[in-house]
Design a protein with these regions (language model features):
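Short, conserved beta-strand element in jelly-roll/cupin
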Residues: 146, 153-171
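Residues that flank catalytic or metal-binding motifs in active/ligand-binding sites
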Residues: 69, 97-98, 158, 172-174
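Non-heme Fe(II)-dependent double-stranded beta-helix
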Residues: 1-10, 17-145
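Active-site rim elements
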Residues: 69-75, 148-150, 210-221
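Conserved hydrophobic/aromatic beta-strand scaffold that supports enzyme active sites
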Residues: 13-15, 161-165, 218-220
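Double-stranded beta-helix
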Residues: 156, 169-222
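Short, solvent-exposed loop/turn segments at secondary-structure junctions
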Residues: 20-22, 102-104, 108, 150, ...
Length: 222
């Protein structure tokens, strides 16, 4: 644990591999998989979106349209290693502000009329285009580097995000991409000032274009 805490302090990122009960993880994953027809059928029609556009409150919240809250996640939340790590980093009185399922939407699911729009305007969160009854999970289709404090702009930066992969994730399955040590700059305005190098392990990031610094990119696959 000491090594994990040191890594987190140094890089802002830490990975725990093979920590959870795989059977319990897959049981939840399979139940989610069978919950609905994961296809173009979860999307609203173009006519409906134009007539009734929705840009806010289209994602699950705490106690609000949240499929993840229907599951017993004690094997995650009460895992001794996880609890110890969170106690050491956040303090003994930490609380879970929000837990939700995040779904990576493949191109095959996106209706043809919507593909051009989401590509042109780099729309990552598809909640506003999803039928209301299916908005109990968050739907992402690629997303720029960002800090999760963007969802709580008036909050203190005393929070962390924990991602749990319920199934194996490879580089073609929208894995989490992080920038190691970028936390040392603290909260910065989105969209962030980043000069990416597509075929390089590093990118340039800073609070202004005059103060860009070199940071290492990391892709989290399992």
């Amino acid at each position: 644990m000491k090594e994990k805490l040191q890594t987190f302090k140094k890089t802002g990122v830490v990975v725990f591999e093979n920590l959870l009960d795989k059977n319990k993880s897959l049981k939840i994953f399979n139940k989610v998989l069978k919950n609905r027809n994961w296809s173009k059928k979860i999307f609203r029609t173009k006519k409906e979106v134009i007539k009734y556009p929705q840009y806010t409150k289209t994602n699950p919240g705490k106690g609000i349209c949240n499929y993840a809250e229907e599951f017993n996640l004690d094997f995650i939340e009460k895992n001794k290693t996880i609890q110890t790590f969170l106690n050491k980093t956040l303090g003994d009185e930490y609380e879970i502000v929000l837990k939700k399922f995040v779904v990576a939407v493949p191109d095959a699911w996106v209706p043809n009329w919507l593909k051009e729009k989401v590509n042109k305007f780099l729309i990552a969160n598809l909640g506003g285009y999803i039928k209301k009854k299916f908005r109990d999970v968050t739907y992402f289709r690629g997303i720029d580097y960002h800090q999760d404090i963007i969802d709580n702009p008036n909050a203190k930066p005393d929070m962390l995000t924990m991602y749990v992969y319920l199934n194996d994730v490879d580089k073609n399955m929208s894995p989490l991409n992080v920038i190691e040590k970028s936390h040392i700059l603290g909260p910065t305005v989105f969209p962030h000032i980043i000069k990416d190098n597509i075929n390089n392990e590093f990118l340039m990031y800073g609070k202004s274009r005059k103060t860009l610094r070199k940071f290492k990119k990391k892709q989290l696959i399992s």
